[in-house]
């Protein structure tokens, strides 16, 4: 719709990755008469699953829960390769008629809310031409993930300028890289490092996993035998639902046990690692963190591949800090010399909310850190804005699907009331000191100043619990603690334009 000089859509979705495509599918199915567009800053869809190209990039959640609830995952592997996930996302977009709604090379950089018109005025930079344009929308929905695409977190190391080898950050993996015959050091202890190390060890001369402190890891097969059994004996859509709920129950049980009886989970994880590694391997030094399970995300080892490569002597684990770099490699704080041809800095991500978009409310800058999150989806005092942020203790898409259902319910409630704005109300009383994302990972703690706060009770508190959220988002009334309003001027939406 053209409103004078600017196009207007009912819902503007920012991001065409896993969350954004899912959000658009929900809009298409649940609000078929609503107009919408998807802005994507890159030239292709897929988000994370197109950006990351390092060897054996994969999910660290099973695809029966990382997949959309409305689009069954039918491939054989439960823990899928990145290329298969990307194909699944794009095929879903085609199946639901979403692909044509994506505006590529369009980065939303600024969104200005007007209470007079009940609209967001969004400034877009065309990343292919550096031109700017404007689009207006009734509802703005961020599906941008949680990290910067153009820059990963990369600490500076003493003496790194002396190193004569190659530095690589996994977020920007060089095309055609050949590990054959190379001595490779991977710095980091997160999911990326745990995936990369065994993948590189297949061809490299030697791979060293250099971590400042250990992470909890668990081995898991990439094939789910129960899922395969059900897929062969039930109609596929029914089997997918059963498997999905099975895995939701299983992951919730493990998480709750980790929080309530951490010593039990610690011991079980340790026992499994001791059994998988050679006698004499220092499991306590290299795989026994000081924190409790799920204070940081648990890392998945598919088919025990990391343990296998350690057992073969192709991977060495060093738990120590870096003292300095030399021409030929690294010297640790304990004086160990690690020679390297290539250093991979799997040191994390740089968190970014709403893709770095600036928000302005009636002419005043809006800092989300000054506001309280509502159901982890909307922001108190900020009208007609939603954000998709998945679970940190389970598959991202479980929360993304619930978020999409809830946003559609809110939009329907607005229509029933004849409202043009909806604003969550702030809680009475004190706020929680707990951050919006309750993990102690470095990339989260570094970005605390960007994130909304939590309240002390629902709907302003995040519980990271699918069953509680299912009740809150899908079964409970959609309008609790929401203020609905109407624009003071009538919208002129008479001219339809192509997108």
Describe the function of each predicted region.
Residues 54, 346-414:
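Glycine/threonine-rich phosphate-binding loop and adjacent beta-strand/alpha-helix elements that clamp
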Residues 76-148, 314, 324-325:
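Feature captures the FAD/FMN-dependent oxidoreductase FAD-binding
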Residues 9, 13, 18-102, 211-212, ...:
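Beta1-alpha1 glycine-rich phosphate/pyrophosphate-binding loop at the start
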Residues 73-91, 103, 187, 257-266, ...:
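Short beta-strand to alpha-helix junction loop
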Residues 276-339:
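Alpha/beta-hydrolase fold catalytic core
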Residues 14, 134-147, 184-187, 330, ...:
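Short hydrophobic core segments
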Residues 5-8, 12-13, 18, 22-23, ...:
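Rossmann-like dinucleotide-binding core of oxidoreductases
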Residues 401, 405-499:
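C-terminal active-site-capping segments
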């Amino acid at each position: 719709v053209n409103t004078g000089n600017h196009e207007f859509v009912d819902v503007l979705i920012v991001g065409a990755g896993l969350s954004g495509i899912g959000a658009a599918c929900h809009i298409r199915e649940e609000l078929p008469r609503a107009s919408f567009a998807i802005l994507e800053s890159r030239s292709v869809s897929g988000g994370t699953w197109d950006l990351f190209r390092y060897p054996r990039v994969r999910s660290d959640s099973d695809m029966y829960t990382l997949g959309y609830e409305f689009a069954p995952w039918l491939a054989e592997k439960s823990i899928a390769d990145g290329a298969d996930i990307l194909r699944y996302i794009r095929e879903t977009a085609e199946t639901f008629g979403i692909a044509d709604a994506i505006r590529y090379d369009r980065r939303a950089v600024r969104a200005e809310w007007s209470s007079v018109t009940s609209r967001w005025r969004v400034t877009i930079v065309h990343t292919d031409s550096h031109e700017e344009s404007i689009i207006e929308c009734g509802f703005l929905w961020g599906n941008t993930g949680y990290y910067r695409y153009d820059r990963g977190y990369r600490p500076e190391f003493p003496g790194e300028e002396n190193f004569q080898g190659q530095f690589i950050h996994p977020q920007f993996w060089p095309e055609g890289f050949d590990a054959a015959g190379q001595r490779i050091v991977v710095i980091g202890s997160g999911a990326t490092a745990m995936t990369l190390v065994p993948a590189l060890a297949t061809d490299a001369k030697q791979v060293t996993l250099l971590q400042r402190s250990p992470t909890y890891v668990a081995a898991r097969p990439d094939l789910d035998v129960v899922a395969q059994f059900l897929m062969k004996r039930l109609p596929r859509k029914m089997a997918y639902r059963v498997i999905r709920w099975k895995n939701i129950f299983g992951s919730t049980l493990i998480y709750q046990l980790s929080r309530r009886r951490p010593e039990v989970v610690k011991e079980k994880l340790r026992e499994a690692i001791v059994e998988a590694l050679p006698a004499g391997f220092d499991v306590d030094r290299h795989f026994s963190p000081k924190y409790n399970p799920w204070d940081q995300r648990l890392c998945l080892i598919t088919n025990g591949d990391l343990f296998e490569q350690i057992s073969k002597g192709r991977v060495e684990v060093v738990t120590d800090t870096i003292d300095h770099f030399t021409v030929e490699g690294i010297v640790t704080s304990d004086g160990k010399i690690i020679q390297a041809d290539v250093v991979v800095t799997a040191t994390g991500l740089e968190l970014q909310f709403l893709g770095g978009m600036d928000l302005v409310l009636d002419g005043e800058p809006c800092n989300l850190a000054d506001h309280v999150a509502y159901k982890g989806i909307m922001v108190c005092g900020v009208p007609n804005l939603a954000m998709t942020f998945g679970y940190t203790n389970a598959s991202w898409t479980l929360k993304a699907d619930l978020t999409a259902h809830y946003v559609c319910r809110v939009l329907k409630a607005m229509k029933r009331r004849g409202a043009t704005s909806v604003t969550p109300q702030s809680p009475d009383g004190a706020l929680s000191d707990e951050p919006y994302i309750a993990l102690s990972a470095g990339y989260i703690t570094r970005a605390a100043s960007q994130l909304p706060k939590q309240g002390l009770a629902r709907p302003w508190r995040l519980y990271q619990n699918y069953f509680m959220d299912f009740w809150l988002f899908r079964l409970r009334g959609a309008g609790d603690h929401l203020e609905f309003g109407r624009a003071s001027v009538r919208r002129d939406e008479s001219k339809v334009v192509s997108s």
